[in-house]
Amino acid sequence: MSATSIQPLLDILFLGKALTREQTASLFSTLIQGEMNEAVMAAMLMALKIRGETIAEISGAADAMRAAAKPFPYPASSRSQGIIDIVGTGGDGFNTINISTTAAFVAAAAGAKVAKHGNRSVSSKSGSSDLLAQFGIDLTMSPELASRCLESLNLCFLFAPHYHGGVKHAVPVRQALKTRTLFNVLGPLINPARPEFMLLGVYSPELVTPIARVLQALGTQRAMVVHGSGLDEVALHGSTQVAELKDGEIIEYQLTPADFGVPQAQISELEGGEPAQNAQITQSILQGQGSDAHTHAVAINAGCALYLCGLSDSVKAGTALALNTIKSGKAFELLNQLAKVSSEAQE
């Protein structure tokens, strides 16, 4: 859309009124095509933020980003089983170990098909992509190779900038604004594999139910949107607020570590470090040699994923399956297999 054709939509925003899903998609399409100047972009993002983004607006922005993404060739057998993403918005302010990334290896080794959409760090010193790079896993693996990994190994990692090139147009504005905008919640919603199932952690308890409604609007089959006592994942150090999407309905409840059959730990026990240190921690967990707190934090998140995929009938059973999978060594074996496939492709 040209500057003149988006002006009526901007005028609606500047009056403090909400846009429709389609109108928001039009604005974000213009942005990611590089056809929106930075002053307009900043004004648009702040107008949305100050009023508060609606479900329709978040869904519309996600529609535009999904439509513009580099295609992912979805493997047939994975489609019949269904794919899950275990992902967080980041930005929770805690520098924890890489819980969701490590949980992805465990869930995949236990039988789930995991397509993890990730980026470099937002709130910690080490995001999922920072961690994977430590293991020699190629972040810019072709979509075709990633699809083959999903098919044969049950796991692939999709590096967000590799699939969403248009986001680069927003980077200078986001850096200049130095505040959260709609982009902070979009990342988990725009996985190019379009997973049927999602375990999605959010940085604020106020986002739990709205983001579940967005997933509902986007056609996600089953999901748990979680905020765990300050963390954008299921908490081992306190209660977790959940909005679960199942059979088209959203139910809200709380979970505690006891619901997973594991003891509570202190948040300080989950503190992470630089990528190299976090890689060592992940390796220890997957080898069955991690601390109880590290292992349990990963297992309860993997357990929720296994529950959502239908591989266990409760989060407690899912956690037990995750712990057994770690003990078996299968998750560590999977890490080595993925690194091997990645390095062979780079030769």
Curated annotation (Swiss-Prot):
Pathway: Amino-acid biosynthesis; L-tryptophan biosynthesis; L-tryptophan from chorismate: step 2/5. GO terms for biological process: L-tryptophan biosynthetic process. It catalyses: N-(5-phospho-beta-D-ribosyl)anthranilate + diphosphate = 5-phospho-alpha-D-ribose 1-diphosphate + anthranilate. 5-phospho-alpha-D-ribose 1-diphosphate binds at residues 88, 91-92, 96, 98-101, 116-124, 128. The keyword Glycosyltransferase applies. It is an enzyme of class 2 (transferase). One of its GO terms (cellular component) is cytosol. HAMAP family: TrpD. Keywords: Amino-acid biosynthesis, Aromatic amino acid biosynthesis, Glycosyltransferase, Magnesium, Metal-binding, Transferase, Tryptophan biosynthesis. It comes from Shewanella sp. (strain ANA-3). Its cofactor is Mg(2+). This is Anthranilate phosphoribosyltransferase. GO terms for molecular function: anthranilate phosphoribosyltransferase activity; magnesium ion binding. Anthranilate 2 binds at residue 174. It comes from the Bacteria. Homodimer. Catalyzes the transfer of the phosphoribosyl group of 5-phosphorylribose-1-pyrophosphate (PRPP) to anthranilate to yield N-(5'-phosphoribosyl)-anthranilate (PRA). Its EC number is 2.4.2.18. Anthranilate 1 binds at residues 88, 119. Mg(2+) 2 binds at residues 232-233. Binds 2 magnesium ions per monomer. The keyword Ribonucleoprotein does not apply. Belongs to the anthranilate phosphoribosyltransferase family. It holds the Pfam family Glycos_trans_3N. Mg(2+) 1 binds at residues 100, 233.
